[in-house]
Amino acid sequence: MKKIIHFAREKRIKSYRSILVFSFTQRLFMSISMNIIGPVIPLITVDLDIGLEYMGRIISFGTFALLISTIAAGFLLEIFGFKKIIFTGAVFILAGCTGLVFSYTIVIFIIAYTILQMGIGMLTVATLSLVGNHYFKNKSKSILISNIGLTVGAVVAPLLVSLSVYVNMGWQFIFFYLAIPQVILIAVLLFLKVPGGRKNFSAAGLKNLFHANRIIASHPYIALCCFIAFLYISTMQTFYTWFTSYFSSLNVSLDTSSLILAIYTTATVAGMLVKNYMVKHVEDKKLLLASISLSFVFLLSAFLFSNLTVKVIFIFLFGVNVAGNFSLTFSMGLNIGPRFTNIVSSLLHASSYLGVVFFQYLSGYMSENFSKNSVLYIDLALLLILIIVIAIINKRELKYLSREINIA
């Protein structure tokens, strides 16, 4: 074992782009694991004999676990470094996927899903913080490239569901195939040269860290960035999770709605690529405001038109515009400087998942008790609030923040 560890240390991958490639790949497979649940909700509810409201509670509980691990990851990164936290997150995802393979009872499903979400929480913060820190001079483009992995994973997930339905494979076995890439990525991590944690982290250093984090979290500019993330990810996750359930109310079959979902997620990939080009020429805030405004218009149009073809076209246009806006928000938050990448990443991700905890449950409750159109009502309201918040955020307030953070 010592020889293997020594060999890994000697042969570490040192390429400048290796961290970006690893982050992209890890976020790709992490996204598939995270987004596979939404399209198979109709199968899970039948297989485990539970209602949509109960499923919404499970998703909210899992998202709460994700929220806690996200908050913890921001602090743990400062102490243990990127490699150990990424390794731990990957192991949790591996364990969660393995548990979901054997989820033939509701108890096993809840435990395995919670473990999976905890691993995702660690990896979302650690991988994006790593990219933001390592490529700070080109942060907007690098963050967008890394997050394209998330978007591609969201495309692959519904396609896997359609394939599993076509070959009559149980939804549990999808997670067996998702566990394999994590084993490979854990092995690659051993060879990857990644910054470590702080050595001899003292109690005074921990106190200073909490002091700085408190000031950053309470600053109006950072707080508004967190609120944008809160609203935006809630919109994205509720729309994606309850997508097939919404189309089932229109008498569209699961395999067809999964393909439509794949079209939507393909549009989000296209949107990420477009933003990757536009971010060089347009200020982050202006691009964010335009994207959210157009997203509202196209989602409202998709809701108003009853023709399925027209509805799919507007959903595609919605996907192009709604994609990549968390990356822009994160890039705006990083204007504070590379020193505080970990805490900004942790705050924005925690805010995102806090919104998902509430709105996933609300979407499930309203879909079960009122109408499956409820998710669109919720998302349209969130987009409208987003437009207002983005319009009032002001980057100039940041110039005073560095004076307030008085730590060594």
Positions of PLM-derived features:
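A late C-terminal transmembrane helix in Major Facilitator Superfamily
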Residues: 336-372, 379
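C-terminal transmembrane helical hairpin of 12-TM major facilitator-type secondary transporters
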Residues: 283-329
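Helix-breaking motifs and short loop linkers at transmembrane-helix boundaries and internal kinks
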Residues: 49, 81, 102-107, 136, ...
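Extracytoplasmic gate region of multi-pass secondary transporters
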Residues: 37-38, 220-262, 266-272
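Cytoplasmic helix-loop-helix junction between adjacent transmembrane helices
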Residues: 112-148
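Conserved MFS/SLC helix-loop-helix module at the cytosolic interface between two early adjacent transmembrane helices
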Residues: 68-106
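Helix-loop-helix hairpin linking two adjacent transmembrane segments in secondary transporters
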Residues: 145-193
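Helix-to-loop junctions at the C-terminal end of transmembrane segments
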Residues: 69-81, 271-283, 367
